Amino acid sequence: CIGASICQQGVRDSQSVLQRAVQAVREANIPDGALPKVCISGCTSSCSGHQAAAIGFQGTVKAVPGGKPAPAFAIFLGGSDALGHAHFGDTIGTVYEEQLPALLVELGQAAAAAGQNWQTWSAADPDAVNSIIAKYV
C-alpha cells in the first residue's frame, strides 16, 4: 500500500505510519521475531493484505470523545497467508494513528520479555495480547 499521500483511494497515509512504527520499534530495541510481519493498508482495498496478516491495520477514523473524528486504524489479528492455511484475522478494535507505534512496541516488548517469538507467545498467551491491545482501543 502506497498510502493516501499518493493513492486517491487512501484514507490514511500507511507509509508514514509504517516509518514511525519502524522507528519506534528500533528505538525500543525490540528483537527480531518478537513481532510478526505487520501489514498496513490506508483503506479497505487491502493492498497490503492486512486481513490475512498476523497483525494488520486498515486506515479509518475513530471518534474522539466530545470531539471530531481522528485518524485511526482498525486492527486485524490472527490472519495468515500461508499456503493451505490462509484465513482472515479478526477485527478487534481501532487504534488512534498516533498510538499505533506504541501499541506495536508494547506487544514486542511483552513477547521479548517472555523470551519467545511472536508466533509462540501470541498462541501461548492470547489473554496478554488482548490485554495490551485493549489499552489502545
Cite the ranges covered by each PLM segment.
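Peripheral terminal and linker regions in Fe-S/redox and tRNA-modifying enzymes
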Residues: 1-137
